[in-house]
Design a protein with these regions (language model features):
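Bacterial N-terminal signal peptides that target proteins for export
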Residues: 3-18, 29
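C-terminal segment of classical bacterial N-terminal signal peptides
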Residues: 22-32
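A composition-driven surface/loop motif
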Residues: 32-191
Length: 191
């Protein structure tokens, strides 16, 4: 009989809609984990979530972005400044820092640009690295190449330094480099 079929049909439709809402909102969803890279800017880890616009990090302005595919950190008219930690800390093997325009890195009591794997600064622009009381640029047991750009490093301690001079290499190609380390050395501790 049609009069009892209609309420059953509506009842079944309401039950189906309720089940869909439960499935959509109550069941756990899959979260996509972000990838962390061995690169820190002003104490903040660079990840797949923030790598396209690192200027959102406190202490960072201008264009700063990291491309993990070719290990390229691009600085364009950037300022990266911290009073509590390194401006840039890298453990990436083969990191290239491309400088476009004039870029300024500064720290108070920490190394400004510190890295433990080979690093190249390139790109035709200018990089000014300044630390009040630690290394402006620190090749910690690894190699530094400055290629086709201008780098000015200044510190009350070390300008551009290796760790102990046993195996670190410092290469300058078609570049202008100025280093001032008033306390301990302007360029020192390279093999």
């Amino acid at each position: 009989d049609i009069t009892t079929m209609k309420p059953n049909l509506l009842k079944n439709m309401y039950a189906t809609i309720a089940a869909l809402f439960v499935a959509m909102f109550a069941l756990p969803t899959t979260m996509h984990a972000q990838t962390e890279y061995d690169l820190t800017i002003c104490g903040t880890k660079v990840t797949s979530a923030n790598c396209n616009d690192l200027s959102k990090i406190d202490g960072v302005s201008g264009t700063v972005k990291y491309n993990p595919g070719n290990k390229l950190l691009t600085l364009q008219g950037a300022t990266i400044s911290s009073n509590t930690t390194n401006a840039i800390l890298s453990y990436i093997d083969g990191l290239m820092i491309k400088v476009i325009g004039t870029n300024n890195l500064s720290t108070a009591g920490n190394t400004t640009l510190s890295f433990r794997k080979p690093l190249t600064i390139m790109g035709g622009g200018v990089l000014n690295a300044k630390s009040q009381s630690d290394c402006a640029i620190y090749a910690n047991g690894t190699n530094l190449t400055i290629d086709n750009c201008t780098v000015n490093a200044e510190s009350g301690a070390y300008g551009i330094a290796g760790n102990n001079g046993s195996n670190e290499k410092f290469t300058i190609r078609n570049a202008t480099v100025t280093a001032i380390g008033t306390g301990n050395g302007s360029i020192c501790d390279f093999a």
